[in-house]
Amino acid sequence: MNRPAQAAAAAHTFFVANPGHQEMRQNLEYYQAMVGVREDDFTDLEAKPHLSEFRLGVRFYTEEQPAAAILHLEKALEEYFVADAECRALCEGPYDYEGYNYLEYNADLFQAITDHSMQVLSCKQGCVTELASQPGREKALEDFLPSHFNYLQFAYYKNGNYEKAIECAKTYLLFFPHDEVMNQNLAYYTAVLGENLARLIQPREEIQVYRQRSLMEKELLFFSYDIFSIPFVDPDTWTPEEVIPKRLREKQK
């Protein structure tokens, strides 16, 4: 059966993941020229909801449509935490021996528990990279979760909502407390709204919980790296230096 719209979507989905594929590029050009194929038929069938909403939010932000940007960025955050919960749940499984032959793996109970626990925690930390990865892109989006609040604080400001602008600015500063521009923005929003009201506004609770949980996991992973030589690559740039053991910090210099 002739289904050009479905074919266009399938071709677009493949091309998003393989942007260097010339034959598929030609196919897309062919579908674009076909009568009856609309622009919105070229959809990514495998798109992650949180990334799709984020891209829409950023697009409206760039086009100076703050209300639409807020709508999609807030939806992106909702979808992000759904995806994060799913990703972390998948980490809860049996020990993956990776390069080991399980018949040759020899560990006492304490070491086996440690190896498995650290593998699960490392996998959960890896969800940061997994959720920020886009098809066809080699590198994940850096500081993906905090960046939502960078966009949102300014979008809320442009929309005249200083309470939300302050909330989002304070939330962003949980990750980057010394960010000069964000601190200046917060000071301005506070001056406009009034210090008495601004003082009552707190960073988003779910982000405070997320950050605290992440830091606890990082501390355990860095400790096991330092003591048991179980490697850990931190996916975040915002991790405070004091979370990393001194010996590891010195090695990284």
Task: Identify what each model region corresponds to.
Residues 1, 12, 29, 57, ...:
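Conserved small-residue packing positions in alpha-helical repeats and bundles
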Residues 2-5, 31-55, 95-134, 189-220, ...:
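Alpha-helical linker/edge segments of TPR/alpha-solenoid repeat scaffolds
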Residues 4-5, 66-67, 161-162:
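TPR-repeat structural position
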Residues 9-13, 53, 60, 65, ...:
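Alpha-helical solenoid repeat scaffolds, predominantly canonical TPR units
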Residues 17-30, 80-89, 174-188, 197-200, ...:
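Boundary/linker segments of alpha-helical solenoid repeat arrays
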Residues 18-19, 47, 64, 74, ...:
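Short coil turns that delineate tetratricopeptide repeat
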Residues 25, 46, 50-53, 149, ...:
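TPR repeat positional signature
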